C-alpha cells in the first residue's frame, strides 16, 4: 500500500511557473522560439484555422496597464461594451486568455516532444496537427475477433468551474496563475457558454477556443489517468491506441476514499483488472473500452470508473452514462463508421481413414462499414438527391461558373473518400460517388438549359471524371498486415490525417 501511495504522490519537479513569464518577461515570444515551438516546429500549438492576431508583448503591456488602473475590480454587472483604456474588457480578456493559454501549453508540448523522441530506433511520425481523433486509427485496426464486451462511456463533464481549475493544481507552482484562471472563468463566462452537452461531443464557445480546449483537454487527461495508472501497474494492460500521447498523471488527492470503497488491500482490486486483452480509445466526449473478459469483469470496470470519478472530482456520476454491450450482438455508430463484429462461416472437410467429417467454423471479423442510410439522408438534406438516393440538381449553385460547380462537387466527393477510406468495404462509396457525379451533371445541364445527355455529349464525360477523381497530396497512414498479397494491398485501409477538418462528418448522429 505504501508503494502505491509513493507511486501516486505528486512529483513537484513537474510543476511550472506559468504567469510569471507572461508578466515579467517582455519578449515572451522569444521563449517559445528558443524551445523550438515556433510555427514551423510546433506539434501542439499550431492550428490551421486559428486567427493569430496578437503578440505577447501586447499581452504583457495589457496586464501591466490593467494592474495600474485596477480594472480587475469591474463588476460582472457591467456591460461588455463598457470600455476602459480605449478598448472593451472583452477584448482585454480574449487577448490575455489567449496569451495565458499559449504559456501553459509550452511545458506540455515540450513533454510530448521529449516522449516522442524517446523512441530509440523507431521512426515516429511527428505532425503539428496531431489530435485525439488520430488515435482511433490503430484502435479500428486492432484485432477484435477475440473480444466479447465493450463499455460505451460518456465522459462526465465538470458541473462546476472550480473543477477545471483544480485539474491544473499539480502542474502549477505559482498560485497567481490559478487566480487569473478563476478570474477568466467567473468574470466573463458561465458554465453554459463554456461547455454544453447537447451533442455526443462537447461544444465550446467561439471566443477563446484555444483557452477552452486546453482546459477541457486537461480535465479529460485527468479522467483518463485511471487507465494509465492501471496500465503501469499491469504489464499486460494494453493501451495500443495512445502510445506517446498519454503518460502517467498524479491523482493522489482523494485516492484514499477510493481505496475504502473497494477493499483494504488495493492490490486485490488491481488484480481484477489485469486483462491481457484490453483496448481503449477516446474521441470527443465518448470513450470505448473493449475487453475479452466476462460480463462480471466489465461490471467491475463500470463500478470502478463510477466510484473513481465521483471521489476524484467530487461530482455525481450516473451509472447510466456507462453501458455494457456484447460486441457480437451490437453495432455501433462510431465516428461516422458503422462498426460491428460479424461471423464468417467456413466449412472444413476432414477425412480419417474411410470416414469423412464436415466441420463448421464461425470466425469473427470486425468490420468498419460506411452507413449508407444516414449518408444518403445527409445528401438528401443538402439537396443532392432524394431520400431514396436518386440524384437531383442543385439549383442554388446554378449561378456559379462551370469550374466552380465541378470543383465543389469534386471537393465533397474527395472529402467523403478521404474520411471513409478506412472502411473495410468501399462499395458504398462508389454509390455515393455516382450520386454526386450525376447530381453535378444535372446541375450543369440545368444551368445551360439542356438535358444531361446533351451536355455530356457536348462537353465530354471525361470532364467530370477528371475533377471527381483528382487526388490531393494529403498525409496518410497505413498499417501493415501479417500477410501482404496483391489483393490485400488493393483492399488495405488508408487513414488520412486531415479527416478532422472534413465538415462535421464525425459529429452527425
Curated annotation (Swiss-Prot):
Protein's UniProt keywords contain Chloroplast: yes
Annotated Gene Ontology cellular component terms: chloroplast
GO biological process: mRNA processing; RNA splicing; tRNA processing
Residue runs in coiled coils: none
Compartment(s) of residence: Plastid, Chloroplast
Keywords: Chloroplast, mRNA processing, Plastid, RNA-binding, tRNA processing
Any one GO molecular-function label of the UniProt entry: RNA binding
InterPro entries per record: Domain_X, Maturase_MatK, Maturase_MatK_N
Top-level division of the source organism's lineage: Eukaryota
Function: Usually encoded in the trnK tRNA gene intron. Probably assists in splicing its own and other chloroplast group II introns.
HAMAP family named among the record's database cross-references: MatK
UniProt record similarity statement: Belongs to the intron maturase 2 family. MatK subfamily.
Protein name: Maturase K
Organism: Nicotiana benthamiana
Amino acid at each position: 500500500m505504501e508503494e502505491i501511495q509513493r507511486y501516486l504522490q505528486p512529483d513537484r519537479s513537474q510543476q511550472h511557473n506559468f504567469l510569471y513569464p507572461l508578466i515579467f518577461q517582455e519578449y515572451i515570444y522569444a521563449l517559445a522560439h528558443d524551445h523550438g515551438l515556433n510555427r514551423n516546429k510546433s506539434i501542439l500549438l499550431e492550428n490551421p484555422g486559428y486567427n493569430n492576431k496578437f503578440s505577447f508583448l501586447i499581452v504583457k503591456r495589457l496586464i501591466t496597464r490593467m494592474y495600474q488602473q485596477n480594472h480587475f475590480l469591474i463588476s460582472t454587472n457591467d456591460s461588455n461594451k463598457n470600455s476602459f483604456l480605449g478598448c472593451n474588457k472583452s477584448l482585454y480578456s480574449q487577448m490575455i486568455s489567449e496569451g495565458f493559454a499559449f504559456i501553459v501549453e509550452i511545458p506540455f508540448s515540450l513533454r510530448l516532444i521529449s516522449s516522442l523522441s524517446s523512441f530509440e530506433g523507431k521512426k515516429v511520425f511527428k505532425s503539428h496537427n496531431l489530435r485525439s481523433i488520430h488515435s482511433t486509427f490503430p484502435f479500428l485496426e486492432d484485432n477484435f475477433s477475440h473480444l466479447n464486451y465493450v463499455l460505451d462511456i460518456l465522459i462526465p463533464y465538470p458541473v462546476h468551474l472550480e473543477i477545471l481549475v483544480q485539474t491544473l493544481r499539480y502542474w502549477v507552482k505559482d498560485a497567481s496563475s490559478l487566480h487569473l484562471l478563476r478570474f477568466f472563468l467567473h468574470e466573463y463566462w458561465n458554465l453554459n457558454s463554456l461547455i454544453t452537452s447537447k451533442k455526443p461531443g462537447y461544444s465550446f464557445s467561439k471566443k477563446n477556443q484555444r483557452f477552452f480546449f486546453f482546459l477541457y483537454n486537461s480535465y479529460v487527461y485527468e479522467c483518463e489517468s485511471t487507465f494509465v495508472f492501471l496500465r503501469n501497474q499491469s504489464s499486460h494492460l494494453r493501451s495500443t491506441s495512445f502510445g506517446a500521447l498519454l503518460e502517467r498523471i498524479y491523482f493522489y488527492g482523494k485516492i484514499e476514499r477510493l481505496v475504502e470503497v473497494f477493499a483494504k488491500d488495493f492490490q486485490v482490486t488491481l488484480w481484477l483488472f489485469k486483462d491481457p486483452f484490453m483496448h481503449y480509445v477516446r474521441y470527443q466526449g465518448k470513450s470505448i473500452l473493449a475487453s475479452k473478459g466476462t460480463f462480471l469483469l466489465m461490471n467491475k470496470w463500470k463500478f470502478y470508473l463510477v466510484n473513481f470519478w465521483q471521489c476524484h472530482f467530487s461530482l455525481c456520476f450516473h451509472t447510466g452514462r456507462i453501458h455494457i454491450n456484447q460486441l457480437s450482438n451490437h453495432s455501433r455508430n462510431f465516428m461516422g463508421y458503422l462498426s460491428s463484429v460479424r461471423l464468417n462461416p467456413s466449412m472444413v472437410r476432414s477425412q480419417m481413414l474411410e470416414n469423412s467429417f464436415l466441420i463448421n467454423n464461425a470466425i469473427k471479423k470486425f468490420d468498419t462499414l460506411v452507413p449508407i442510410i444516414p449518408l444518403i439522408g445527409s445528401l438528401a438534406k443538402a439537396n443532392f438527391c432524394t431520400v431514396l438516393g436518386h440524384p437531383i440538381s442543385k439549383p442554388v449553385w446554378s449561378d456559379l461558373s462551370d469550374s466552380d460547380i465541378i470543383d465543389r462537387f469534386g471537393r465533397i466527393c474527395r472529402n467523403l473518400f478521404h474520411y471513409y477510406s478506412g472502411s473495410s468495404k468501399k462499395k458504398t462509396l462508389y454509390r455515393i460517388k455516382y450520386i454526386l457525379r450525376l447530381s453535378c451533371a444535372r446541375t450543369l445541364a440545368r444551368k445551360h438549359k439542356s438535358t444531361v445527355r446533351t451536355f455530356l455529349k457536348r462537353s465530354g464525360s471525361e470532364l467530370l471524371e477528371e475533377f471527381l477523381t483528382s487526388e490531393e497530396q494529403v498525409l496518410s497512414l497505413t498499417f501493415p498486415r501479417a500477410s501482404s498479397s496483391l489483393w490485400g494491398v488493393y483492399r488495405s485501409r488508408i487513414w488520412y490525417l486531415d479527416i478532422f477538418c472534413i465538415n462535421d462528418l464525425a459529429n452527425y448522429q
